[in-house]
Amino acid sequence: MKLKLVAVAVTTLLAAGAVNAAEVYNKDGNKLDLYGKVHAQHYFSDDTGSDGDKTYARLGFKGETQINDQLTGFGQWEYEFKGNRSENQGSDKDKTRLAFAGLKFAEFGSFDYGRNYGVAYDIGAWTDVLPEFGGDTWTQTDVFMTGRTTGVATYRNTDFFGLVEGLNFAAQYQGKNDRDGVQEANGDGFGLSATYEYEGFGVGATYAKSDRTDKQVNAASNFNANGKNAEVWAAGLKYDANDIYLAATYSETLNMTTFGDDHIANKTQNFEAVAQYQFDFGLRPSIAYLKSKGKDIGSWGDQDLVEYIDLGATYYFNKNMSTFVDYKINLLDDTNFTKDARVSTDNVVAVGLNYQF
């Protein structure tokens, strides 16, 4: 019975997005939840950039206030503290992951603004479920609307105005962020996503298009794209029931995806697939395959940017404590391209303990 309760708790935890919040306040229509985790981990690799201590902690809150029977206000903030820095280095590389606020209008959907996930990640998240790695062929932080990003206004509708259970859609606008680092800059853009889930099965698609900044266009080189617009489309399938999780996504990007030493590919074709099983006693093994093919990379032509098999496992002691191992088997060969572009070709093993509340 105890083992079954662990499995139920883990399944609930995963369905909730790996956030097991502690309720701090709930009175008179106002609610505040606090959540966080300590992720103690170490990487082993011949690649010096992917070797060593990678410990960090995260802390966040979710709040909501009931304005009336049809209108609810909400907000969320999340911050990451690096645990592998010396005390003299202080808060170097600490970062705000999420910071947004919005309004929910009953069955008519919600609107929010701030630093949030781009709508393209609605599909990318389906395969970004590995113990440590994964989700890195086309969903990237601060790269347009493919991951966490800034200055996004998002409208979301659940169950299609309350008429079709499981049918969700979103529309998003992102304002210009003209940063010095061209890999993290973006012009004005919009994105759309739609998903439908029924009895464990899910299907979804997304599309986003943005202007590129002048700095991005002018940074064109033998490795960097020179197009004036960045685009992505993606489609995905998943099955999540009976302790089984299966998911696959296919996507194509244009003038968007970063690779190697901060380069931007003209075009990529990306595939990700993952399979997991949740045992009653807390073990969750995982296997995945990911590949990103770069197209028309300057004089280099078509090149593999990412390709690896991932073997991993997580063991949940309970809903708050887990341990994991994740082995990234890199299938890329050492070539003149990978050396010049500084694309890693080494294997990586990650091991760690995770406490979350």
From Swiss-Prot:
Q: What cellular component terms from Gene Ontology apply here?
A: cell outer membrane; pore complex
Q: How does it sit in the membrane?
A: Multi-pass membrane protein
InterPro entries associated with the record: Gram-neg_bact_OMP (IPR050298), Gram_neg_porin_domain (IPR033900), Porin_dom_sf (IPR023614), Porin_gammaproteobac (IPR001897), Porin_Gram-ve (IPR001702), Porin_Gram-ve_CS (IPR013793)
Among its keywords, does the record have Signal? Answer: yes
Transcription regulation keyword on record? no
State its location(s).
Cell outer membrane
Name the Gene Ontology biological process terms: monoatomic ion transmembrane transport
Which key words are in the record? Cell outer membrane, Ion transport, Membrane, Porin, Signal, Transmembrane, Transmembrane beta strand, Transport
Q: Write one Gene Ontology MF term.
A: porin activity
Matches recorded under Pfam families: Porin_1 (PF00267)
Q: What is its main location?
A: membrane
Residues spanning the signal sequence? 1-21
Q: How does it assemble?
A: Homotrimer.
Q: What does this protein do?
A: Forms pores that allow passive diffusion of small molecules across the outer membrane.
Q: PANTHER family attached here?
A: OUTER MEMBRANE PORIN F-RELATED, PROTEIN YDDL-RELATED
- Please give the family membership noted in the entry: Belongs to the Gram-negative porin family.
Q: What is the protein's name according to its record?
A: Outer membrane porin protein OmpD
